[in-house]
Amino acid sequence: VFEMDMNKLNPNSHAHVNSTLARQLALYVTMYSPLQMAADLPENYERFMDAFQFIKDVALDWDDSRYLEAEPGRYITAARKAKGTNDWFIGCTSSEQGHASTLKLDFLDADKQYIATVYADAKDADYKTNPQAYVIRKGIVSPKTVLKLKAAPGGGYAISIMEVKDKAELKGLKKLSGNI
């Protein structure tokens, strides 16, 4: 769901989806289901096609699942390896308190090269006041990479980590590390 304000669909409603757009992407990873769907109106996705790319890329089934951090009722960060590939997807969802993560990508294969695309809450994102604020960062990652990310209140982040198939994919990209 990319449209959080239900008043736009039903003017008499004051309902609100308690989530940021980045958190909605993360749910594709944190909540396992081999039957995924895009549950919003097509025109709402069309407004955010850069973020919709994550939904197009995310796998439906997994060879490996790892829970990188969690505190019940506060946050969860899961990493899942797409079945039959070397591609990984990470999702973090947080409560209304938000969450700061330090992610070590040491589960990646040291013999492979990867490109990560991070879909994260923007600095001013908030599930109540600015749920559609997000940033996208893309760069090269390895098992030595450490990323620091902040999930806004009611927010999260999603990361696709794709194995490099052709060195040309690396052109113009820099290493991702530190604060995202």
For each feature predicted by the language model, list its residue ranges.
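Conserved, mostly hydrophobic/aromatic
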Residues: 30, 90, 154
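Carbohydrate-binding surface patches
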Residues: 72-115, 119, 157-160
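C-terminal beta-strand-rich structural cap/linker in extracellular carbohydrate-active enzymes
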Residues: 138-180
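Solvent-exposed beta-strand/loop surfaces of large extracellular or lumenal domains
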Residues: 118-144
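Acidic/polar loop patches that form or flank catalytic/metal-binding clefts of enzymes
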Residues: 34-45, 64-66, 102, 115
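Glycan-recognition and catalytic regions of carbohydrate-active enzymes
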Residues: 43-89, 124-130
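Flexible loop/turn segments at secondary-structure boundaries
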Residues: 3-7, 37-39, 46-48, 97-100, ...
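Glycan-recognition surfaces
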Residues: 1-42, 69-70, 120
